[in-house]
Amino acid sequence: MTAGTAPGTRTAAGPVTADPPDRRPPRRRVPALILAATALHLALMAMCTVLYPAFTGPDETFHVDLAYAYSKGHGPYPPGGRPLARGIEVVYGGLTVPPADGPYADAPVRPRGQRPSIEAAGGDARAQGYPVPNQMVQHPPLYYLIEAGVLRLPGVDRLPYDRQVALLRWVSVLMVAPLPLLAWATARRLVGDGPVALTAGVLPVTLPGLSHIGAVVNNDNLLILAVALLALPLARVLTGDLRVRTGALVGLLLGLALLAKGLALVLPVAVAAAYLVAWLRHRRRPLIPLAVAAVVSAGVGGWWWVRNVVLFHTVQPDGLGPAWGTLFSGPPSPGRTWLDFAPAFARRLSARFWGGLGYPDAPQLPEWVTGGWLVALVAGALVGIAVGIGGRWGRAAASTLALPAVGFAALIFYGAGTAYVFNGRLPGIHGRYVYAGLTGLAVLFAIGVGRLGGRLGRLVPLLLLAAGLLTHLWAWRLLVAQWWVPRHTVGDHGAVLRGAIGAIRLWSPWPTVPTLAPFVAVVVLSPAALLAAALATRRPREPSPEPSPEPSPPAGIDDRDDLAEPAADAAAETTARR
């Protein structure tokens, strides 16, 4: 071939042929910043497993109880059909949860060697002093079956109750740990390598409330993992991957989400929207992969909701049962409107999204901190939708990323609003219910602030991480001051520190070294992550190619691993089509 001759052109000697372009670019490592952010995210959750004594997570007593019931071979239960286990009642009743009259440092607790197992405290016998049934029976069984598997491991049934709870918590930690990595991979699939993908990966590390929820026994954590995993193949769908096996993967992950929690019932809308937009963007019908996704998801998780309709004549029954549900709801008290409810909803969701530290609220970050973070996230995501991801229907494609979070928030709004109009209650308004949609929001936020930052967009990951670490420092300082500092040490900084460390060691299920190791890891990894972010801002990077406005042909789809390889080389693909 002569210099400057394009492949496929004709010369005097005949058509020129060329070797097909390599569609598999060299594999790249995950950026150091994303590895550091993921490690820091893990360390923060590990720290929270110690900062929060057993059963201080939201509804943690009942999540542990249901996992314990499944470990005994019981369940699923009808509404109102699961009384609290006597063993759970005994060990929970012996604690001051949350601290009522003072910090944990001043509350009595059994020495570590004298704490009984759940089995030794009464096992699965019916609770004697707590008559209210376990409401968690309304949830699908997957999370509890996973946790039950941990409780059935050899020797676990004989461990002290706080170590049993700690092991269950670590299952949650491992579920939420990959979130920064998955957010980065999803963003990179859509917009390529660069500051935008790094920003998306850093955002999950900025939420103290996420560190808290990820460190306790709660089925939200399985939903967070399932939806974050689902975002990655949906990003492939939006970029033209309409293969049947990708549809099967989408269906599998959607089905697992449906087996995690009822909030997942909004996800089929997001999946259908992604395939519809992919049809418009790439002008290829996705009916077969979409049908495969529907069938697989129904077989994996959709059956649970059909079962509810058949047995209980409703999609999700009240887990308390009719009698207790009516008692807890209370009598009607008219006079309130949806307009009255909206600002109350916004304030509570804002406080519990970036905050959500206590049980249920105190200690609490200032409203301007939690509200400022949430406003910034929403504003950045809206700009990200306006910018789009490039190519045909780019704004529509970007908007599908927000659908899970919007759907979760809409369900919360409707459920709590109905109760508020009925008699003024504000139940179920928790930021953790929206965390499963955080991956899509992180990508949109990163796109938006990247556009707003212009040439300074390279600094965004560093600034975001620094702001997030300051928020964490503020949050955990509040928690330690209220929960762990002995009252008699207030005013003496040295005594405050020694007293808090001593109290944490006393309440911990573990000896001193594993108790303090997560705190040391956070102290070490925080500057390491900041250094990695600073190096990422200084290191020049080639700009990612703009997504082609032309629809990608099926031949342009490859099987590369999104977590290990960059986006396809647009120039090579254009050459191949000539």
Give the location of each predicted region.
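Transmembrane helical bundles and short interhelical boundary loops of multi-pass, membrane-embedded
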Residues: P363-V369, L456-P547, P551, A572-R578
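Hydrophobic, aromatic-rich transmembrane alpha-helices
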Residues: A351-A402, F445, L462, V522-P540
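Interfacial juxtamembrane loops and adjacent helix segments
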Residues: K72-L168, T326-F328, Y359-P363
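Perimembrane helix-loop-helix junctions
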Residues: T239, L267-S297, G388-I389
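Membrane-lumen/periplasm interface segments of multi-pass, membrane-embedded glycan/lipid transferases
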Residues: W305, V309-G388, L497-F519
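Transmembrane-helix signature of polytopic, membrane-embedded enzymes
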Residues: A32, L159-D162, A183-T206, R458
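Membrane-interface alpha helices of multi-pass inner-membrane proteins
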Residues: T246-G262, L267-P268
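Transmembrane-helix motifs of polytopic, lipid-linked glycan transferases
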Residues: R163-L190, L229
